[in-house]
Amino acid sequence: MKIYSSIKKRCEHCRIVKRKGKRYVICKVNPSHKQRQG
């Protein structure tokens, strides 16, 4: 998982989710697209 100050969807399968005050990008098709903000 990469940590960025600004996160973007990298493909059409990526979803942005908020958990415990942090924003995540989750991608089931391409797990290498996982990101966290902050």
Curated annotation (Swiss-Prot):
A molecular-function term among this protein's GO annotations: structural constituent of ribosome
Signal peptide annotation: none
InterPro entries associated with the record: Ribosomal_bL36, Ribosomal_bL36_sp, Ribosomal_LSU_bL36
Gene Ontology CC terms, in alphabetical order: ribonucleoprotein complex; ribosome
Keyword annotations: Ribonucleoprotein, Ribosomal protein
Recorded superkingdom: Bacteria
GO term, biological process aspect, one: translation
The UniProt record lists the keyword Lipid biosynthesis: no
Pfam families from the UniProt entry: Ribosomal_L36
Family label: Belongs to the bacterial ribosomal protein bL36 family.
Protein name in UniProt: Large ribosomal subunit protein bL36
Protein species of origin: Pelodictyon phaeoclathratiforme (strain DSM 5477 / BU-1)
Underlying gene: rpmJ
